[in-house]
Amino acid sequence: MSSPDNQGPDDGHENDGPHNDGPHDDWDPGDLTGLEASAQAFTRTVDSLTAEDLAEPSLLPRWTRAHVIAHVALNGLALAAVIDGVVHDNPVAMYESDEQRDADIEELSGAEPSELRERHLAATTAFADAVALMDENHWAGRIDRLPDGPAWSMVTVVPTRRRELEIHHVDLGTSYTRSEWPEDFVVELLNAVTVDQASSGPFEVRATDVGRSWYVGGEGGPNVMGTGADLGWWLTGRGDGEGLSSDADELPSLGPWRRASATIGS
């Protein structure tokens, strides 16, 4: 069972105006400030869920809330193991195979709520500890999702992990919604998804609440307007564009997220 892809290259920073910039000079790829806040919010929600709540469907097809939490925990542990491998010059892939990944999620989703919570907390700690070992040379490396790829840049690891937490937090279908995403995360998300979005043609998205714009698939084409959170939700393949408007007759059609060299699968 697979969740929708919701990862892509993160550009770290954007100046005002419609473009997709790379990281600025003083951007620290190991800064965990935003990630820690996202992890704490996710943990509070996990702590609030009963066994009955965990068995309820999530917003993702065929997945319960327990499946989502299991995936987030195992993703964090996998990333921590990969980082540790890079630091100790013993590289490993995140997952042996997609089939094994899915089987592990299925198994953990059936665990007792206490074990599910413990694995999530262990993943949070392991990831932070692994990142703390990184130096400048390590950040220049790349990571494989599977033994035969795809590979992506190490500098995307922290923002990618944060996207896992924030997007899947909403996927749990609890009281936490995309409208609660922090503004810095919304900008980070739009930096990522506009770069990696395969679409039917070029268009521009304008986040009315943050006053910024991004091109998707090149310059030109219609404008799509809405809050940054609504735009990010739509561009990750979630929802039908509720809350968005366009100067065209309808919203542009979206293709699947590409698994390009700089993207990371869930």
Protein language model features and the residues they cover:
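Hydrophobic packing residues in well-ordered alpha-helices of helical domains and bundles
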Residues: 32-35, 113-120, 158-161
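Conserved alpha-helical segments that form or flank metal/cofactor-binding pockets of metalloenzymes
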Residues: 66-97
